[in-house]
Design a protein with these regions (language model features):
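C-terminal helicase module of SF1/SF2 nucleic-acid helicases/translocases
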Residues: 1-26, 31-38, 43-55, 73, ...
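Post-DEXD/H (motif II) to motif III coupling segment of the RecA-like Helicase ATP-binding lobe
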Residues: 51-131
Length: 335
């Protein structure tokens, strides 16, 4: 492993071992972006690719030099630009829809921020021996939110975690929650990835209208990691006070709560935010200059030209045009 908490000596030793072939697989955080080259890498896997910008992903691949490694990008919810490129045939696309055994769909609700809603959700989870996440994404007010929850639900063991805490303190709080010595973890969105706590099966996301679809889907995925029914509450102000785009995001995440719904959520995100700039760095946004139809026509022509010239050998066994599909329906309707 290679991460920011390693000493310089240990980082250098790890990279030396990978360069000489003593290590076959190197697992790294984004610390690999700075001052590290991997010229002998033949395969690169980028997890949670929606957390990276276009330039970051390009820079990671360039670290392999002229080796041009195979690149596998993995994400629960592809960003609009990446998804659009896959749908257009620029990149190959594989979808994993089969969930782990015994998993159940997460029940998702849009709810107001009031004492009755919060206490009912928390008490239900604690009564069945579980634990609760409460997400509040403003560090300045997070202690006050934890105090308010303590007033509404007295006697509970509540911990607070956010990115501005010292690393050892945050690690201590997270370990206490994992070990079950805390009932509720009030945290910012730092919990949206990397936590697998089967006993935590209720999450309340405060001010959910301020999050993107990918963030909401990732945070909802912190619960429902066992064979118990899990619940996600999107805590928002009155819907009439929200923007149209915020309402569409909330409706999308509420409607697509079934297992394996990440791809459908990504499609809705593409519809809401637009496909972005395929020739630049913008990862979302609408085509306003030339229009979508003309842009798609130009893109199709460019792809066809590359597949018949520079990359002809690579696509020699694949047809230029997608196969036509004929569907016959047997009905009793009159002709």
């Amino acid at each position: 492993p290679l991460h920011g908490r390693l000493t310089t000596e240990l980082k250098d030793a790890t990279m030396q071992a990978f360069t000489t072939g003593e290590i076959d697989v190197l697992v790294s955080t984004t610390v690999i972006e700075v001052g590290v080259d991997v010229p002998n890498a033949t395969v690169m896997v980028i997890m949670d690719a929606d957390r990276f910008g276009v330039s970051q992903r390009g820079a990671l691949r360039e670290k392999a030099g002229e080796n041009n490694p195979h690149l596998l990008i993995m994400t629960a919810t592809p960003i609009p630009r990446t998804l659009h490129m896959s749908l257009m045939g620029v990149r190959d696309l594989s979808i994993i829809e089969t969930p782990p055994e015994d998993r159940l769909a997460i029940q998702t609700y849009i709810s107001p921020y009031d004492e009755a809603t919060v206490t009912r959700a928390i008490e239900f989870e604690l009564d069945r021996g579980g634990q609760v996440f409460f997400v509040h994404n403003r560090v300045q007010g997070i202690e006050g939110v934890a105090d308010l929850i303590g007033q509404w639900c007295p006697g509970l063991r509540i911990g607070v975690a956010h990115g501005q805490m010292p690393g050892d303190m945050m690690e201590k709080i997270l370990l206490q929650f994992i070990e079950g010595t805390l009932d509720i973890l009030v945290a910012t969105n730092i919990i949206e990835s990397g936590l697998d706590i089967p006993n935590a099966n209720t999450i309340l996301i405060n001010q959910a209208q301020n999050f993107g679809l990918s963030d909401l889907h990732q945070m909802r995925g912190r619960v429902g990691r066992s064979n118990l029914k899990a619940f996600c509450y999107l805590i928002v102000p009155p819907l009439f006070s929200l923007t149209q785009e915020a309402r569409r995001r909330l409706q999308a995440i509420e409607q697509h709560s079934e297992l394996g719904s990440g791809f459908q959520i990504a499609l809705r995100d593409l519809d809401i935010r637009g496909a972005g700039n395929m020739l630049g760095g913008e990862q979302s946004g609408f085509i306003t200059e030339i229009g979508l139809e003309l842009f798609q026509k130009i893109l199709d022509e460019a792809i066809r030209e590359l597949r018949t010239t520079e990359y002809a050998e690579l696509y020699a066994d694949q047809p230029l045009d997608p196969p036509a599909t004929e569907v016959l329906l047997d009905t009793d309707a009159p002709a």
